[in-house]
Amino acid sequence: MIKTQNLTKTYGKGEGKVTALDGVDITIRDGEMVAIIGKSGSGKSTLLNLLGGLDKATDGKVFYNDKDLSTMNDSKLSEFRLKNIGFVFQFFDLIPELTAEENVMFPAKLAKKKETSEGELYTALDINDRVKHYPAELSGGQQQRAAIARALINDPDVILCDEPTGNLDKRSGAEVMNLLKKLNQEQNKTVIIVTHDSDIASQCSRIIELSDGRLAN
């Protein structure tokens, strides 16, 4: 279970102070598929970054079951992310100098995992014949499937997605959503998706809406 308490993030000081997130309290149960929606600047990506331990809150806490992310130093937080959270971003963020396979295996090497299920991932994500190619040689949909494989290589319980279909055509976007739903339904992965697309949000089991850094619903 993921829980936040009074989660707050501000930038700047004095008259230039901007509140990106303002006292957000949410609970996401294991195995949920949740959409986070809201207008541009509402705090969606800020919330996702805090949930993923990619940024530190100004105030408040993020809990993964009984683990409080705010008590972890940078080293412990990096280790926790590596083992427990997979990230999928809008622009794929594959390393251009590495093949798809090398990109997928990169987190496993960081975690020093000797055994992985990369072969099964390639088959499930239909990229078996593309793993030796570099990102520039892949379509947008293939790059995103490689990014999803990378997110899953350490078998995390939680997958955080920031506009995962935002840079894809309609068909590729639908394929990515079907993959995420399958992971949620068949492997009980907790999937959290930031999106501005109402169709994407409607496919999730629950919607959290933000407005000006606060819960709108």
Task: Set out the residue ranges of the language-model regions.
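ABC family nucleotide-binding domain
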Residues: 2-210
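Short, Lys/Arg-enriched, disordered terminal segments
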Residues: 1-2, 217
